[in-house]
């Protein structure tokens, strides 16, 4: 990240979210009073990502979607992000029952999972890359990415 502009792909933000949550848990378990700093960093990254890396309706949109230029790795990046955003959200919910600490992420996860189900599913319940729809193509990595989003949403209810 440079200032308020995010550079890179979703998996970059997703992997670091998961790592920061793990470091927080290790530090907290050892009694480190500065452990919360790692959650604060994770929240700053998550806040930037869910604000800057979305379309006008708040749905994750990979930069390579515009020209159908995502390779087999790129089609999984959003799923990696959602998996780790879900991990952050569940950790924040466990730490503090006040939904102001996790509610924004919960809503984002559910909104994206619902969009995939409603807008990015074919008649055989296969999923594409464009979570706002329509289905562009189906393959294992697109399916895996969508399933990561659905799994992240399970604790919060989804697929209305």
Predicted segments, located by residue:
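Active-site cradle of extracellular carbohydrate-active enzymes
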Residues: 1-23
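CBM-like carbohydrate-recognition segments
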Residues: 8, 37, 43-160
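Oxyanion-binding "anion nests"
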Residues: 15-31, 38-54
